[in-house]
């Protein structure tokens, strides 16, 4: 009987301890979620406030009783934001497609093919990750300028069609596929390209989807390179367009409309991430596993 009482007491204390720890954990998680989400909430809230109401707030309010969508209409009419969207869409689609071809072929060569200097070449490729991005931008800018490709989509796209990190990620994923599949395809008379397209790519599709999504996000958020290589508004992306809005005085005078433009630009990426977040995590974990 005594042992039973002791066991019950131990169980009760364990449950209390577990409950306290769970409560503390969820408290800090909730606090962290608020810290992370508050800037986006404030951005959306500001975009829904009337211009006059916003300027009359000496003390900022955390809600609005009279939300309005007029700021969104003004954001698209005050500047050619729709054109910036189309430019960004074109830049993102073409860059992602070309990069996917380049990194897939490069990753396949390093993962499966045998050629002289393969290890040295791969080591040199990885060493490029150690070079500061600022130095690469300077080199790319001089090269694109010498080729006469400033203020062109070609100049925007060319420096972004490859990525050492994505080649490494995809190469590690390709290397996990059993060698027996490669030898079996060779016995069946398949070429290396047939093995790549019919076997490797379907098996490694989660990683490829991850790379595509991450590249789309990267292209959509590009600012430094597009801003550096283009000064013609016909080639502005949404990021450069927002800066043009602000420099033109519109953003300084009408913060709610400025926030409406930022929300409109952010929503596609947020939706993309929320829809494919499981694919992203699955692809990254697959690329980082050995065996």
PLM segments and residue spans:
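A structural signal for multi-pass alpha-helical bundles of membrane permease subunits
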Residues: 2-17, 21-291
């Amino acid at each position: 009987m005594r042992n039973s009482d002791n066991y019950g007491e131990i169980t009760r204390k364990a449950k209390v301890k577990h409950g306290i720890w769970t409560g503390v954990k969820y408290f800090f998680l909730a606090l962290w979620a608020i810290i992370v989400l508050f800037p986006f909430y404030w951005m959306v809230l500001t975009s829904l406030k009337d211009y006059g109401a916003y300027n009359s707030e000496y003390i900022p309010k955390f809600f609005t009783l009279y939300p309005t969508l007029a700021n969104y209409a003004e954001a698209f009419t005050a500047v050619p934001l729709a054109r910036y969207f189309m430019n960004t869409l074109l830049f993102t689609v073409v860059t992602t497609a070309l990069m996917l071809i380049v990194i897939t072929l490069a990753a396949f060569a390093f993962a499966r093919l045998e050629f002289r200097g393969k290890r040295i070449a791969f080591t040199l490729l990885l060493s490029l990750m150690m070079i500061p991005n600022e130095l690469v931008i300077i080199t790319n800018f001089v090269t694109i300028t010498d080729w006469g490709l400033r203020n062109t989509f070609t100049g925007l796209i060319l420096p972004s069609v490859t990525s050492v990190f994505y080649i490494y990620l995809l190469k590690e994923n390709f290397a996990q596929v059993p060698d027996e599949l490669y030898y079996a395809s060779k016995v069946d008379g398949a070429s290396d390209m047939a093995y790549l397209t019919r076997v490797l790519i379907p098996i490694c599709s989660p990683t490829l989807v991850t790379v595509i999504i991450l590249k789309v996000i990267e292209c959509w958020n590009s600012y430094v390179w597009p801003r550096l290589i283009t000064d013609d508004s016909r080639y502005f992306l949404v990021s450069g367009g927002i800066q043009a809005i602000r420099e033109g005085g519109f953003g300084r005078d009408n913060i709610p409309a400025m926030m409406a433009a930022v929300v409109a630009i952010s929503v596609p990426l947020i939706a993309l991430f929320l829809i494919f977040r499981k694919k992203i995590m699955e692809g990254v974990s697959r690329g980082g596993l050995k065996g």
